[in-house]
């Protein structure tokens, strides 16, 4: 693997940090820093016209990808991770073994900023599960730029007649161990009159400000979609942005094609919590698709397009935005 430890790390103008394998497992990449800037100047402004920086752990065929992590020293969060026109990638291409451990991506920092065509991707093709992406932050800001929109994706692309893998979990939240935990009690949906007895602990970030950003956890090819979770006790703003989860040709409560149980019973979900939730020119979408309407495997599985939960403590605002839960080819909406 590759490990970088320094107070300040600057990656500029097409620099690459790579580990890869063919029919083997790629190594891990870790950064332990106070501040990491990638194609960002000392003044915090993205560099204009800079070639993309790539940080990637990838494999092809039999093996799995490694993981990529950004954090501070000695278990502390970093002060800042600032990325412009930067590609962070863990991926398995043409996976032969659908049970390989996926490559995950984690950022733990007080401030994370993703700008100008930055992509954070834990995608797979060929049947392996996609990796998880976890951003543990106090504040998260994203902004599109001349080099494109910001992308955060954990997709499983398999195609027709392929043993599909599950799309991954994408979690945007506070910093466990540093952000005070918040535990809430819930009733089970099947027993609405019972006393709340299910405890769930959250870590809330201070603020999310997402602009020109696409977040998706989509499965293509006989596989369940993933889950996108956002947790803040401040404002969650999505401006000119989209969030999607997609399940294709998968029966809820079934095993995945590789025989392993699906996470969350195969239900995909978008779950956003905040004091205020603001959508402007944005789309929130949960999809289910059946490619072969003759067999229609999803028809027997109950709601299969997943769920959309928008939980605002104070206010919810949607301006020229779409919230959609859809089923295609006889698939059922959630």
Which residues are covered by each model-predicted region?
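Extracellular and secretory-pathway beta-repeat/beta-biased strand scaffolds
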Residues: 1-334
């Amino acid at each position: 693997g590759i490990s970088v430890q320094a107070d300040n790390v600057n990656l500029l103008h097409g620099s690459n940090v790579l580990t890869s394998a063919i029919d083997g497992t790629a190594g891990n990449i870790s950064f332990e820093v106070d501040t990491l800037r990638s194609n960002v100047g000392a003044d915090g402004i993205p560099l204009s016209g800079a070639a993309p920086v790539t940080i990637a752990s990838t494999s092809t065929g039999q093996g799995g990808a490694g993981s990529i992590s950004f954090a501070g020293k000695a278990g502390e969060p970093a002060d800042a991770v600032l990325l412009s026109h930067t590609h962070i990638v863990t991926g398995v291409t043409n996976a032969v073994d659908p049970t390989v451990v996926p490559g995950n991506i984690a950022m733990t920092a007080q401030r994370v900023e993703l700008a100008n065509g930055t992509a954070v991707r834990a995608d797979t093709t060929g049947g392996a599960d996609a990796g998880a992406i976890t951003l543990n932050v106090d504040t998260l800001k994203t902004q599109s730029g001349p080099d494109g929109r910001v992308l955060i994706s954990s997709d499983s692309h398999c195609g027709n007649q392929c043993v599909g893998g599950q799309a991954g979990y994408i979690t945007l939240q506070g910093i466990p161990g540093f952000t005070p935990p918040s535990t809430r009690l819930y009733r089970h949906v099947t027993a609405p009159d019972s006393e709340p007895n299910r405890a769930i602990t959250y870590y809330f970030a201070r603020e999310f400000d997402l602009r020109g950003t696409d977040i998706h956890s989509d499965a293509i090819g006989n596989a369940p979609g993933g889950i996108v979770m956002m947790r803040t006790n401040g404002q969650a703003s999505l401006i000119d942005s989209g969030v999607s989860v997609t399940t294709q040709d998968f029966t809820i409560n079934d095993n995945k094609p590789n025989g392993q149980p699906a996470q969350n019973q195969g239900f995909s979900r978008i779950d956003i919590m905040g004091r205020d939730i603001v959508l402007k020119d944005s789309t929130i979408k949960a999809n289910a698709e059946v490619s072969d309407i003759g067999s229609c495997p999803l028809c027997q599985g109950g709601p299969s397009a997943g769920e959309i939960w928008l939980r605002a403590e104070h206010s919810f605002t949607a301006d020229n935005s779409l919230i959609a839960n859809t089923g295609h080819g006889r698939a059922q909406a959630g």
